Amino acid sequence: MKLASYHCVEFGDNVRVGWDAIIMDTDFHRMKNRETGTFTKGYAPVLIGRNCWIGCRCTILKGTKLPAYCTLAAGTTIGKKIDGEGYKIISNTSELKIVKENYYRELGNDAIVYPVDSINNR
């Protein structure tokens, strides 16, 4: 497992993680909206409930929240909150979709500013 935590990654009890999984609470950069000039935050907590099973080669991105007793199928990429009770098996579909428009990475002005107390106040 590869873990990149600059803000908050929390695991419930008895979580199992398969080999070559990646868990990140950061994008390592921000994105700029070309219309408004505003930037994305670039980080968000990752919360994994108890008794979850993360299959091999899964990628868990910022903003992911898994309720208890969820299984991520091998190779799944997730970056969102799963609502409701757990006991779900989650897998990606083969459908490709555009998730945001009018954003780009502005090189040289894409550093993330993390809250100073984000590590100490979990």
Indicate where each model-derived feature is located.
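Short, catalytically relevant binding-site loops at active-site mouths
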Residues: 8-9, 30
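A contiguous pocket-lining binding segment that forms or flanks enzyme active sites
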Residues: 11, 17
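Extracellular beta-strand scaffolds
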Residues: 9-10, 23
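Glycine-rich hexapeptide-repeat left-handed beta-helix
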Residues: 18-122
